[in-house]
Swiss-Prot record:
CDD domains listed in its UniProt record: UEV_AKTIP
Family: Belongs to the ubiquitin-conjugating enzyme family. FTS subfamily.
Record-linked InterPro entries: UBQ-conjugat_E2_core (IPR000608), UBQ-conjugating_enzyme/RWD (IPR016135)
Protein name in UniProt: Protein crossbronx-like
Chain ranges of the UBC core domain: 17-179
Pfam families: UQ_con (PF00179)
Source organism superkingdom: Eukaryota
Protein backbone atom coordinates (compact mmCIF):
# COMPACT_ATOMS: atom_id res chain seq x y z
CA UNK A 1 0.00 0.00 0.00
CA UNK A 2 1.44 3.38 -0.99
CA UNK A 3 2.34 6.06 1.54
CA UNK A 4 -0.35 8.43 0.25
CA UNK A 5 -3.09 5.84 0.83
CA UNK A 6 -1.79 5.14 4.34
CA UNK A 7 -1.80 8.83 5.22
CA UNK A 8 -5.32 9.22 3.86
CA UNK A 9 -6.49 6.23 5.89
CA UNK A 10 -4.89 7.53 9.08
CA UNK A 11 -6.37 10.99 8.59
CA UNK A 12 -9.85 9.63 7.97
CA UNK A 13 -9.73 7.33 10.98
CA UNK A 14 -8.51 10.25 13.10
CA UNK A 15 -11.49 12.33 11.97
CA UNK A 16 -13.89 9.49 12.78
CA UNK A 17 -12.31 9.08 16.22
CA UNK A 18 -12.58 12.83 16.78
CA UNK A 19 -16.26 12.62 15.82
CA UNK A 20 -16.84 10.01 18.51
CA UNK A 21 -15.10 12.17 21.11
CA UNK A 22 -17.07 15.29 20.22
CA UNK A 23 -20.28 13.25 20.31
CA UNK A 24 -19.28 12.06 23.78
CA UNK A 25 -18.84 15.71 24.83
CA UNK A 26 -22.37 16.48 23.66
CA UNK A 27 -23.77 13.47 25.50
CA UNK A 28 -22.02 14.59 28.70
CA UNK A 29 -23.74 17.97 28.41
CA UNK A 30 -27.09 16.20 28.17
CA UNK A 31 -26.25 14.06 31.21
CA UNK A 32 -25.32 17.12 33.29
CA UNK A 33 -28.78 18.60 32.64
CA UNK A 34 -27.49 22.17 32.79
CA UNK A 35 -30.36 24.62 33.14
CA UNK A 36 -30.63 27.76 31.08
CA UNK A 37 -27.69 27.13 28.76
CA UNK A 38 -27.63 25.11 25.55
CA UNK A 39 -24.91 24.20 23.05
CA UNK A 40 -24.78 21.92 20.02
CA UNK A 41 -22.22 21.14 17.30
CA UNK A 42 -22.91 22.71 13.93
CA UNK A 43 -24.01 20.49 11.05
CA UNK A 44 -21.07 21.47 8.86
CA UNK A 45 -18.28 21.02 11.42
CA UNK A 46 -18.03 19.26 14.77
CA UNK A 47 -15.43 21.85 15.76
CA UNK A 48 -17.95 24.72 15.63
CA UNK A 49 -20.66 24.80 18.29
CA UNK A 50 -23.65 27.11 18.61
CA UNK A 51 -24.86 28.12 22.05
CA UNK A 52 -27.28 30.34 23.93
CA UNK A 53 -27.61 31.21 27.62
CA UNK A 54 -30.71 32.46 29.44
CA UNK A 55 -30.13 34.39 32.68
CA UNK A 56 -32.91 34.89 35.23
CA UNK A 57 -31.26 36.72 38.13
CA UNK A 58 -28.54 39.22 38.97
CA UNK A 59 -27.29 42.16 36.92
CA UNK A 60 -27.98 40.32 33.65
CA UNK A 61 -31.46 39.16 34.66
CA UNK A 62 -33.99 38.48 31.87
CA UNK A 63 -31.27 38.23 29.23
CA UNK A 64 -30.41 35.77 26.49
CA UNK A 65 -26.99 35.81 24.84
CA UNK A 66 -25.78 33.84 21.86
CA UNK A 67 -22.24 32.47 21.65
CA UNK A 68 -20.11 30.14 19.55
CA UNK A 69 -17.44 27.69 20.67
CA UNK A 70 -14.52 26.99 18.31
CA UNK A 71 -12.60 23.81 19.10
CA UNK A 72 -8.92 23.40 18.07
CA UNK A 73 -8.27 21.31 14.96
CA UNK A 74 -6.84 18.43 16.98
CA UNK A 75 -9.39 18.59 19.80
CA UNK A 76 -9.29 17.10 22.39
CA UNK A 77 -5.64 16.10 22.07
CA UNK A 78 -4.29 19.67 21.89
CA UNK A 79 -3.53 21.61 25.07
CA UNK A 80 -4.79 24.72 23.30
CA UNK A 81 -7.98 26.12 24.83
CA UNK A 82 -11.23 26.32 22.85
CA UNK A 83 -12.36 29.80 21.83
CA UNK A 84 -15.69 31.23 22.98
CA UNK A 85 -17.08 34.13 20.93
CA UNK A 86 -20.16 36.04 22.05
CA UNK A 87 -22.46 38.15 19.94
CA UNK A 88 -21.68 41.85 19.83
CA UNK A 89 -22.08 44.43 22.58
CA UNK A 90 -22.03 42.28 25.71
CA UNK A 91 -20.56 44.39 28.50
CA UNK A 92 -18.56 42.21 30.89
CA UNK A 93 -14.98 42.32 32.26
CA UNK A 94 -14.14 38.93 30.76
CA UNK A 95 -15.55 39.62 27.26
CA UNK A 96 -13.37 41.57 24.83
CA UNK A 97 -15.28 44.56 23.38
CA UNK A 98 -13.43 44.19 20.05
CA UNK A 99 -13.24 40.44 19.34
CA UNK A 100 -16.17 39.51 21.65
CA UNK A 101 -14.07 36.58 22.88
CA UNK A 102 -14.39 35.23 26.42
CA UNK A 103 -11.28 34.96 28.60
CA UNK A 104 -11.04 31.35 29.79
CA UNK A 105 -7.73 31.76 31.62
CA UNK A 106 -9.27 32.41 35.07
CA UNK A 107 -10.36 28.76 35.19
CA UNK A 108 -8.33 27.02 32.46
CA UNK A 109 -4.57 27.32 32.11
CA UNK A 110 -4.30 24.59 29.47
CA UNK A 111 -6.75 22.06 28.10
CA UNK A 112 -6.36 18.50 29.36
CA UNK A 113 -8.82 16.01 27.90
CA UNK A 114 -8.75 13.83 31.01
CA UNK A 115 -9.76 16.79 33.19
CA UNK A 116 -11.67 19.28 31.06
CA UNK A 117 -14.86 19.02 29.04
CA UNK A 118 -17.09 21.40 27.13
CA UNK A 119 -19.68 21.32 29.91
CA UNK A 120 -17.04 22.93 32.16
CA UNK A 121 -16.95 25.86 29.74
CA UNK A 122 -20.73 26.14 29.88
CA UNK A 123 -20.65 26.18 33.68
CA UNK A 124 -18.02 28.93 33.56
CA UNK A 125 -20.19 30.97 31.20
CA UNK A 126 -23.06 30.66 33.66
CA UNK A 127 -20.79 31.72 36.53
CA UNK A 128 -19.49 34.93 34.96
CA UNK A 129 -23.03 36.23 34.46
CA UNK A 130 -24.44 34.95 37.76
CA UNK A 131 -21.65 36.58 39.77
CA UNK A 132 -19.65 39.14 37.73
CA UNK A 133 -17.73 40.34 40.78
CA UNK A 134 -16.80 36.85 41.90
CA UNK A 135 -15.65 35.95 38.40
CA UNK A 136 -12.96 38.64 38.44
CA UNK A 137 -11.63 37.87 41.92
CA UNK A 138 -9.67 34.64 41.59
CA UNK A 139 -7.87 32.49 39.02
CA UNK A 140 -8.11 28.71 38.73
CA UNK A 141 -5.41 28.54 41.44
CA UNK A 142 -7.40 30.77 43.80
CA UNK A 143 -5.04 33.71 43.25
CA UNK A 144 -6.35 37.26 42.71
CA UNK A 145 -6.75 38.26 39.06
CA UNK A 146 -4.54 41.27 38.19
CA UNK A 147 -6.69 44.20 37.11
CA UNK A 148 -4.67 44.50 33.90
CA UNK A 149 -5.50 40.91 32.87
CA UNK A 150 -9.21 41.32 32.17
CA UNK A 151 -10.56 41.60 28.63
CA UNK A 152 -12.60 44.76 29.21
CA UNK A 153 -10.94 47.28 31.51
CA UNK A 154 -13.83 49.74 31.32
CA UNK A 155 -16.26 47.08 32.51
CA UNK A 156 -13.85 46.13 35.29
CA UNK A 157 -13.49 49.75 36.41
CA UNK A 158 -17.24 50.35 36.51
CA UNK A 159 -17.91 47.07 38.30
CA UNK A 160 -15.38 48.02 40.98
CA UNK A 161 -16.28 51.70 41.36
CA UNK A 162 -19.75 52.40 39.99
CA UNK A 163 -22.20 49.51 40.12
CA UNK A 164 -25.08 51.71 38.95
CA UNK A 165 -23.35 52.61 35.69
CA UNK A 166 -22.21 49.01 35.25
CA UNK A 167 -25.78 47.80 35.65
CA UNK A 168 -26.94 50.32 33.04
CA UNK A 169 -24.33 49.09 30.55
CA UNK A 170 -25.30 45.49 31.28
CA UNK A 171 -28.94 46.42 30.68
CA UNK A 172 -27.98 47.94 27.34
CA UNK A 173 -26.37 44.61 26.41
CA UNK A 174 -29.61 42.83 27.27
CA UNK A 175 -31.71 45.22 25.19
CA UNK A 176 -29.37 44.84 22.20
CA UNK A 177 -29.41 41.06 22.47
CA UNK A 178 -33.20 40.77 22.51
CA UNK A 179 -33.46 43.25 19.66
CA UNK A 180 -31.37 40.95 17.47
CA UNK A 181 -32.51 37.57 18.83
CA UNK A 182 -34.86 37.00 15.90
CA UNK A 183 -32.47 38.17 13.18
CA UNK A 184 -31.89 36.02 10.13
CA UNK A 185 -29.20 33.41 10.89
CA UNK A 186 -25.73 34.67 9.87
CA UNK A 187 -24.79 31.16 8.73
CA UNK A 188 -26.63 28.61 6.62
CA UNK A 189 -26.47 25.69 9.04
CA UNK A 190 -29.48 23.55 10.07
CA UNK A 191 -28.12 23.28 13.62
CA UNK A 192 -28.04 27.04 14.19
CA UNK A 193 -30.33 27.80 17.13
CA UNK A 194 -33.33 29.70 15.80
CA UNK A 195 -35.94 31.66 17.76
CA UNK A 196 -39.37 32.62 16.53
CA UNK A 197 -41.70 35.28 17.84
CA UNK A 198 -44.79 33.92 19.56
CA UNK A 199 -47.66 33.28 17.16
CA UNK A 200 -50.91 32.00 18.72
CA UNK A 201 -51.97 30.05 15.64
CA UNK A 202 -48.69 28.13 15.71
CA UNK A 203 -47.71 27.92 19.38
CA UNK A 204 -50.92 28.06 21.43
CA UNK A 205 -51.64 24.33 21.12
CA UNK A 206 -48.21 23.48 22.51
CA UNK A 207 -48.63 26.00 25.34
CA UNK A 208 -51.86 24.26 26.36
CA UNK A 209 -50.11 20.91 26.39
CA UNK A 210 -47.28 22.23 28.54
CA UNK A 211 -49.70 23.79 31.05
CA UNK A 212 -51.75 20.61 31.30
CA UNK A 213 -51.00 18.39 34.33
CA UNK A 214 -51.32 15.35 32.11
CA UNK A 215 -49.90 16.71 28.89
CA UNK A 216 -48.09 13.46 28.14
CA UNK A 217 -51.47 11.78 27.65
CA UNK A 218 -52.86 14.43 25.31
CA UNK A 219 -53.28 13.38 21.66
CA UNK A 220 -50.29 14.02 19.49
CA UNK A 221 -50.68 16.27 16.48
CA UNK A 222 -50.89 14.44 13.15
CA UNK A 223 -49.23 17.29 11.29
CA UNK A 224 -45.72 16.64 9.94
CA UNK A 225 -42.86 17.63 12.26
CA UNK A 226 -41.17 20.98 11.73
CA UNK A 227 -37.71 21.18 10.27
CA UNK A 228 -35.14 20.15 12.86
CA UNK A 229 -32.79 22.98 13.78
CA UNK A 230 -30.83 21.16 16.46
CA UNK A 231 -29.67 17.73 15.23
CA UNK A 232 -26.32 15.97 15.46
CA UNK A 233 -25.13 12.70 13.94
CA UNK A 234 -25.98 9.69 16.08
CA UNK A 235 -23.48 7.09 17.20
CA UNK A 236 -25.08 4.64 14.78
CA UNK A 237 -24.43 6.97 11.86
CA UNK A 238 -20.82 7.46 12.90
CA UNK A 239 -20.37 3.70 13.21
CA UNK A 240 -21.84 3.14 9.76
CA UNK A 241 -19.46 5.73 8.33
CA UNK A 242 -16.51 4.08 10.02
CA UNK A 243 -17.47 0.65 8.66
CA UNK A 244 -17.87 2.08 5.16
CA UNK A 245 -14.46 3.74 5.35
CA UNK A 246 -12.87 0.51 6.60
CA UNK A 247 -14.38 -1.48 3.71
CA UNK A 248 -13.01 1.11 1.31
CA UNK A 249 -9.51 0.82 2.75
CA UNK A 250 -9.60 -2.98 2.51
CA UNK A 251 -10.60 -2.67 -1.14
CA UNK A 252 -7.68 -0.35 -1.83
CA UNK A 253 -5.27 -2.75 -0.15
CA UNK A 254 -6.53 -5.66 -2.26
CA UNK A 255 -6.16 -3.63 -5.47
CA UNK A 256 -2.62 -2.68 -4.59
Amino acid sequence: MCLETTLTKNKTLALINQGYQVLAEYEMIEQKKLRGIYAIPSYSSLLLWFGVIFIHSGMYSESAFRFSILLPDNFPDENCLPTVIFQKDIFHPHICPISHSLDLSPVFKDWHKDQHHIWHILKYIQAIFADPEGSVCNTHNGEPIPLTDVNNMEAMRLLANNRVDFALRAKASIVWSWKHMFDKPPINDPHYIIFERYRPEKHQAMMKRIKSSSWYSLPTSTSPPSTCVARIESARQLLAEEEAQTRGFHSLEMVE
